[in-house]
Amino acid sequence: MKRYFKALGYLLSVHVLALLVMTLFRLVEFIALHGMIVDAGASRVMAFVKGVWFDNVIACYISVLPVAVLLVAASLGWCHRRLLRGINIWYAAWFAIAFMPSAANTPYFQYFFKNINSSIFGWFGYVATTSGMLLQESSYWLYIALYFVFTGAFIYALIRLRRYFEGLFLLPKDNMHLVLVVSRFLISAVMIGACLFGIRGRMGYNPIKVSQAYYCEDSFLNQLGINPAFNLLTSALDDMRKENKELHLMPYAEAITNTRQWLGITGKVDSTNILKREVVNDSLVMKKNHPNVVVILMESMSANLLGTFGNQQPLTPTLDSLYHHSLAFTHFYSAGIHTNHGMTATLYSFPALMFRNLMKGTVTPRRKGIATVLKQYGYENMFFMTHEAQYDNMKAFFQTNGYDDIFSQENYPKSEVVNSFGVSDHFEMGYALNTINQKAKTGKPFMATILTVSNHPPYIIPDFFKPKTKEKETQIVEYADWAIGDFLKKASREPWYKNTIFVIQADHGKLVGKSEGELPQSYNHIPLIIFGPGVPQQQYAGLGMQVDVMPTLFGLMNLNYEYEGFGVDLLKQQRPMVFYSADNQIVARDHQRCFVYNPSMNRSFCYDVLPNGNLKETKQESKFQDLKNYVFSNIQAAEYIERHQQ
């Protein structure tokens, strides 16, 4: 039995070695991000214990075939060197792949405050852009290097283990007596069964889920225990399940009825266009000389970065000044946490459906929005982006849905491209200004949408710009704010400026400071600033969201239009609540409460909003039923439109 147990010893040694490496990756994440911990009393050790549990699932997935092959072969007395070397190659290849999400998870979590998931596959269609982002952002280099160091050390240890056990396999063959052979097969069956049980992760009706990692009130520690490869694998499998391709939060009929009621839509429901209605503004004051419109979507500009909202560093003097001299919104929220969500919500009044990209598809989706309505009024519509036009299917989507001209990296000098996301904000805005000036000379009204991207890794700050802060992450915010101010200063000298309404907002926020709940508020709380002719200077303290931009803007412009969106004119109708998404979570909130729901976990998180704006978790879920109904209804109605009205 000696050779058999040596084979078993080899398998167990590799398994333990793999668990050790995955724990090291978790330790790196803990060291790098431990400042995110808000529950001082929560056990740190338990996160690592939970982590080994989840790591073991991945290790068992990889080990089940080698365990079966090697132990069966050893049971029959056959342990050839070639077999061991083949198994070693198997382990090296698959664990090298499994370690990748663990290495990438630290910077990913730092940016998104959630573990790496299937949403990253949306980046795979842009290999050059994605690889450029990874290689050009210096803060990622450490984790790339650690991946190669840890993986290299693992493979080196594998080779040493193989050589050690190869020598032991030179021992005389095990006795092939029937009883001993049967005994070895029984032990093999137990080990294979143990491996399969490790894949399942737990006893009971359901296999292990991410919810098993939750043990305290701290969101970072709860997620620290989840193996990134496990999270990536299960989220991808969830995407492929038929029942998860279509959201089933509540019956469609109930959701549509509720949503129409909240939006003030009356009359019979048209199943082919459930939210269609005619919006009639005051035609008596409708201007014959329609104002131009400039919409600026700022990358990751969380409200928490503004001094107006309490940031102690002087990062955004331009936005802070505009905020106090414009129509500004205090409690305004993004539809999601990705740029494509911000664009479809702001420009087309359609909410985010968790992590789906609603602009992509073999057949380009059709939407009615700001550009399509303005086109009916004779506007020329332009869209400016820093990167390639094909990114996220932008060129096809926007040209299909109301935009006449798309300006992108393909239009700019190659010498101005600074990273994988194209040109810097100031160059893009300078190019946009020159183009707008030419367009204005035609005498036709225009709409220009400018999407910035500088406040997204890799951060590139022009040499001429001299920031006041020391950290690159805050310096880039200073630069982005300056670029807006420089654009507006130069635009103010142009004849078209006085007849132009400007809309400035973020596409979404980002993590600023610590998260006091399951989802950082700073990720969706964003500024919205509107100014121009006929726009009142006031601070709007009610609730608002990106889908409200279109009806609010058209209300200010006194335009009549056919509307199919989820928004309301905030100057005429107050929202009792808002709702939004964050990849695998959906949220509803009002001024006093915040409700977060994770459909894959079927778990709710309920928070009271404290006077200082922070969140405090509460277990009194019954008090949040109206918020739950609000977000479930709106998301389910959006799901219906996405599936039945395209």
Go through the PLM ranges and name each one:
Residues 2-244:
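Transmembrane and membrane-interface helices of multi-pass
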Residues 6, 43, 81, 118, ...:
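Generic alpha-helical secondary structure signal
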Residues 30, 109, 164, 218, ...:
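Charged, low-complexity, helix-prone segments enriched in Lys/Glu/Asp/Gln
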Residues 55, 133, 156, 160, ...:
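Residues that form generic nucleotide/phosphate-binding pockets
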Residues 81-82, 243-254, 359-363, 567-568:
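Short alpha-helical "patches" and their helix-cap loops
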Residues 126, 214, 218, 225-230, ...:
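The feature marks either
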Residues 264-646:
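Solvent-exposed soluble domains appended to multi-pass membrane proteins
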